């Protein structure tokens, strides 16, 4: 994949000088608002077919960060998506004895950017990109179908079910649209 559009989007945000790189939250609504702001701002600098749907970003952020941003990874590492550390990236260890190294981000927005870049660049998410492109061409957004492409995101065999359940909950609460 050509990473130039993603790099250009990141540089554009960095140079804009008007973006709030960090946000404080004390409740679920503030957490959701911060994630939305970052996702919308970053996506606005990407070509349409490189954007990760806001609904999907919210579903994964809320699932991975304990539904309200209060997971240890979110609070101590600004990591809202359970993104693993690679090579020499700063990390914290998972407390579940798995030895998983979870990446630490300096700023909260960096987690949203890394999540978007991960889905756009990693070979693990080629199915996601293909489905997103198909939906883009057909002018549709089906979060359920996109979720089904993310089985490699976590080792949990019930991960897809849990994401779909989170999407259902967020739809019921009026936080995300139907996605179809």
Question: Where do the PLM segments sit?
Answer:
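Catalytic cores of secreted/periplasmic lytic hydrolases that degrade extracellular macromolecules
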Residues: 2-59, 63-180
